Amino acid sequence: MPTINQLVRKGRASETTKSKSPALQDCPQRRGVCTRVYTTTPKKPNSALRKVAKVRLTNGFEVISYIGGEGHNLQEHSVVLIRGGRVKDLPGVRYHMVRGSLDTQGVKDRKQARSKYGAKRAKAGK
């Protein structure tokens, strides 16, 4: 326990929190270009082929980003928007693709949670 005099001289050291998405550099999203689009397998006990892309961001960072939703149109040199948010069963994947912006199309025939997948509202007649 420090004395009052020690606190006057030094003060309390504030704990610095480590960012969970350092490549964004405190921005909500970042633009980038896909350098590789591929599938990878999750950790045990899950089993699937998860769609991911390696993206070079405008600030020079190269990150792995998850492509959510069913089906996508991304390939090498696609310009994409990245947001934070990790995928628990994919080690090293700390970012998500924003669907429906830039070169990334929204998910087709999506009825629920449309805003998360960049899907427009379906016509009432159909």
Swiss-Prot record:
Spell out the residue ranges making up region: Disordered.
1-26, 103-126
A Pfam family name for this chain?
A: Ribosom_S12_S23
Could you name the domain of life of the organism this protein comes from? Bacteria
- Which residue ranges have biased composition labelled Basic residues? 113-126
Entry's InterPro entries? NA-bd_OB-fold, Ribosomal_uS12, Ribosomal_uS12_bac
What pairs make up the disulfide bonds?
none
Q: Which UniProt keywords apply?
A: Methylation, Ribonucleoprotein, Ribosomal protein, RNA-binding, rRNA-binding, tRNA-binding
Offer a single GO CC term for the protein.
small ribosomal subunit
Q: Which SUPFAM superfamilies match?
A: Nucleic acid-binding proteins (SSF50249)
Does tRNA-binding appear among the keywords? yes
Q: Which GO terms describe its biological process?
A: translation
Task: Say yes or no: keyword Cytoplasm present.
Answer: no
Modified sites of kind 3-methylthioaspartic acid:
89
**Molecular function, one GO term:** structural constituent of ribosome
Member of which family?
Belongs to the universal ribosomal protein uS12 family.
Purpose: With S4 and S5 plays an important role in translational accuracy. Interacts with and stabilizes bases of the 16S rRNA that are involved in tRNA selection in the A site and with the mRNA backbone. Located at the interface of the 30S and 50S subunits, it traverses the body of the 30S subunit contacting proteins on the other side and probably holding the rRNA structure together. The combined cluster of proteins S8, S12 and S17 appears to hold together the shoulder and platform of the 30S subunit.
Q: Which NCBIfam families match?
A: rpsL_bact
Q: How does it assemble?
A: Part of the 30S ribosomal subunit. Contacts proteins S8 and S17. May interact with IF1 in the 30S initiation complex.
Designated name of the protein: Small ribosomal subunit protein uS12
Q: Which gene encodes it?
A: rpsL
